[in-house]
Amino acid sequence: MRPIMLVGHERPLTQVKYNKEGDLVFSCSKDSVASVWYSINGERLGTLEGHTGTIWSIDVDPFTESCVTGSADYSIKVWKVQTGTVIHTWTAPVPIKRVEFSPCGDYILAVLDDVMRYPGSINVYKVSRDPVTKEIKEFVEEPILVINTQENHKGVTVAGWSAEGKYIIACHKDGKVSKYNAKTGEFITSIELHTQTIGDIQFSPDRTYFITSSRDSMAYILDVESMEQLKSYEADCPLNSACITPLKEFVILGGGQAARDVTTTSAREGKFEARFYHKIFEDEIGRVKGHFGPLNYVAVNPQGTSYTSGGEDGFARIHHFEKSYFDFKYDVEKAAEAKEHMQTASA
């Protein structure tokens, strides 16, 4: 896989995201600027400028009409993708660590950090759209839902929506994962999963299960309804991000030795690679090198044809999957396919 390097940020990347169609990549960074790129060739469409601090998170709605950013400058901004202009700003008492549109695009989830005596919360904001153009016409200024952190939990680091926006899944600094009713904010359950802070949560294409990644070098897949642990993946370095690939039964893990702990310039020592694991068998099947610092985020194209990594080195790298990626199968998978083919032929 020959990567396309996206050069446009001056400081470490914090998140990269594809739109639903997979033709655009959105990136944000500690340089307070977000960028929009064509995923096919890495050409930059433009920048989103207006924040005055680190942009910790970015997301794009299902219609690629608008995108939302959350920043350390205590603000959440909504942007019109076509023009790159700010169409609304919400202010908060603390930095925003994660933002995400609901699957229907009518709600925005924001994770507020637990700093400066603020206990931390998940705020949900509502927007109203034109039924035809899907353009946002109205913003509700106050959050319609504020989910405060449970007493016996540490602050929320990241959160996301389940299928149809039914639940909000939240990950905590103490390694716990919580589930809330997205309509009422009611706490449903929580489990102790990781031994260190959880840095990322990403969902399967149908949003019925999700993967978490942590500084404890582990990634887990959990079922949304039962909160049961389905799979686990162990890496040899702290993990910052993990995603689930469509089309193929793989997961991609990204991380590496923390930048402040690196005492050598060798990328091999820091383990700055994207790791591919088989989703079912939990085996590591390959690595992709390239970054010369930890991978802060990995995101996969919803169409399953590429993935993008954002690094501490200030670069994002788009990797388009080659034929060998799609052809890769375990012997047991090949045998199962051959058996199915024979049964179909004889039927």
UniProtKB/Swiss-Prot annotation:
Intervals holding WD repeats: 8-47, 50-89, 91-135, 151-190, 193-232, 290-329
GO biological process, one term: formation of cytoplasmic translation initiation complex
SUPFAM superfamilies: WD40 repeat-like
Localization of this protein: Cytoplasm
Key words, A-Z: Cytoplasm, Initiation factor, Protein biosynthesis, Repeat, WD repeat
SMART domains noted in UniProt: WD40
GO CC field: eukaryotic 43S preinitiation complex; eukaryotic 48S preinitiation complex; eukaryotic translation initiation factor 3 complex, eIF3e; eukaryotic translation initiation factor 3 complex, eIF3m; nuclear periphery
Disulfide bonds: none
Any one GO molecular-function label of the UniProt entry: translation initiation factor activity
Annotated Pfam families: EIF3I (PF24805)
Family, per entry: Belongs to the eIF-3 subunit I family.
Family annotation (PANTHER family): EUKARYOTIC TRANSLATION INITIATION FACTOR 3 SUBUNIT I (PTHR19877:SF1)
Subunit structure: Component of the eukaryotic translation initiation factor 3 (eIF-3) complex.
Function: Component of the eukaryotic translation initiation factor 3 (eIF-3) complex, which is involved in protein synthesis of a specialized repertoire of mRNAs and, together with other initiation factors, stimulates binding of mRNA and methionyl-tRNAi to the 40S ribosome. The eIF-3 complex specifically targets and initiates translation of a subset of mRNAs involved in cell proliferation.
Protein name: Eukaryotic translation initiation factor 3 subunit I
Source organism of this protein record: Vanderwaltozyma polyspora (strain ATCC 22028 / DSM 70294 / BCRC 21397 / CBS 2163 / NBRC 10782 / NRRL Y-8283 / UCD 57-17)
Lineage of producing organism: Eukaryota, Fungi, Dikarya, Ascomycota, Saccharomycotina
